[in-house]
């Protein structure tokens, strides 16, 4: 979702609250709970899951391994649910011609650097750069080159833009900021 006028352009960035992250977090949670229940049922010798008798799985070594996989899966799942809850990576890019300032804001992990805020003068922006990596999984990322500070990504590295979409986004950004486009 974008808000745009002649002087101000605000582009909202979607964070970790994507459908794919929800799906993976649910799959990991359910799968790891299943592994953990099978490991516990093999230890207790009872059927906690009625799909198969617990006597078919010995606690040593299969039950221990399944319990370990279940616990590891719960940790990974809790990490995914935490990133979804905190909405890591979300924020906005605000380009303000009137003030001559570009503000980039992102939410990070809780702690000292929870709020990531970068403020740059438009005069310090050298160019908008498109970086293209080919291969089986091509990657196209849009960067803003800033004098003295390096490059700042304007798009997520995991977004799969078509060449036309990334060119359109780069052209809009370069036109609004009045800077050239570079392709690498």
Swiss-Prot record:
Family statement: Belongs to the Ycf4 family.
Note the SS bond partners.
Answer: none
Tell me the membrane topology, using the record's own terms: Multi-pass membrane protein
Protein known as: Photosystem I assembly protein Ycf4
The record's principal subcellular location, in a coarse class, is: plastid
Q: Which compartments does it reside in?
A: Plastid, Chloroplast thylakoid membrane
Looking at the Swiss-Prot or TrEMBL record, what is one Pfam family this protein matches? Ycf4
- What is an annotated GO biological process for this record, any one? photosynthesis
List, alphabetically, the PANTHER family matched. Answer: PHOTOSYSTEM I ASSEMBLY PROTEIN YCF4, PTHR33288
State the species of origin: Piper cenocladum
Mind telling me which GO cellular component terms the entry cites?
chloroplast thylakoid membrane; photosystem I
Q: What's this chain's function?
A: Seems to be required for the assembly of the photosystem I complex.
TM region(s), chain numbering: 22-42, 64-84
């Amino acid at each position: 979702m974008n808000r745009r006028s002649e002087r101000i352009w605000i582009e909202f960035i979607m964070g970790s609250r994507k459908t794919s992250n929800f799906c993976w977090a649910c799959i990991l949670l359910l799968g790891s709970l299943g592994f953990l229940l099978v490991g516990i049922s093999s230890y207790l010798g009872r059927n906690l899951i009625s799909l198969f008798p617990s006597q078919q799985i010995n606690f040593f070594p299969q039950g221990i391994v399944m319990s370990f996989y279940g616990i590891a899966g719960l940790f990974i799942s809790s990490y995914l649910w935490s990133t979804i809850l905190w909405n890591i990576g979300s924020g906005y890019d605000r380009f303000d011609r009137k003030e001559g300032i570009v503000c980039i804001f992102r939410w990070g992990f809780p702690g000292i650097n929870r709020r990531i805020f970068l403020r740059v003068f438009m005069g310090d922006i050298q160019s908008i750069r498109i970086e293209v990596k080919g291969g089986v999984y091509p990657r196209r990322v849009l960067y803003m080159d800033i004098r003295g500070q390096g490059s700042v990504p304007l798009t997520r590295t995991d977004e799969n833009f078509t060449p036309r979409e990334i060119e359109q986004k780069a052209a809009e950004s370069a036109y609004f900021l009045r800077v050239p486009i570079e392709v690498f």
